[in-house]
């Protein structure tokens, strides 16, 4: 059995997401959960960037479109916050796009819209 990529780090991040969900419950918009996560990261001394911008290149040329990851945590894990009925293939594709342009290996998709927080690991 293979070892989980960034096991301890991802457990810490998911734990903070669970704390936010336990405190706020479901029903808020994404921005509220992002603000709460930013608070938790700061309170727990976890290094993060919010709305991290990633340029896209084609044949060495900068394209007009850029990607914006909700969070990059510990300079290596992308965290995408969702408030949707369920995590879909489109959400996973979005995370893969972020992984491709960032050269990171792990993205965490976290859905706060349900009574029980849903999360998914995306490895690239």
What do these predicted regions represent?
Residues 25, 69-85, 98:
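Conserved catalytic cores of phosphodiester-cleaving nucleases, focusing on short active-site segments
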Residues 82-124:
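Nucleic-acid nuclease catalytic cores
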Residues 49, 70-72, 100, 111:
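Well-ordered beta-strand positions
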Residues 1-47, 117, 123-124:
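Solvent-exposed, charged helical/coil patches
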Residues 62-69:
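Basic/aromatic recognition patch in beta-strand/loop cores that engages polyanionic ligands
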Residues 44-58:
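A short acidic/basic microdomain associated with nuclease active sites
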């Amino acid at each position: 059995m293979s070892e989980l990529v960034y096991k301890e780090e991802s457990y810490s991040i998911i734990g903070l997401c669970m704390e936010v969900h336990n405190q706020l419950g479901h029903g808020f918009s994404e921005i509220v959960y992002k603000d709460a996560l930013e608070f938790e990261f700061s309170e727990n001394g976890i290094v993060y960037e919010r709305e991290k911008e990633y340029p896209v290149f084609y044949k060495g040329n900068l394209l007009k479109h850029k990607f914006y990851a909700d969070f990059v945590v510990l300079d290596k894990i992308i965290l995408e916050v969702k408030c949707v009925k369920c995590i879909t293939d489109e959400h996973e594709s979005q995370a893969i796009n972020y992984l491709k342009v960032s050269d990171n290996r792990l993205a965490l998709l976290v859905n706060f819209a349900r009574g029980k927080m849903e999360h998914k690991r995306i490895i690239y």
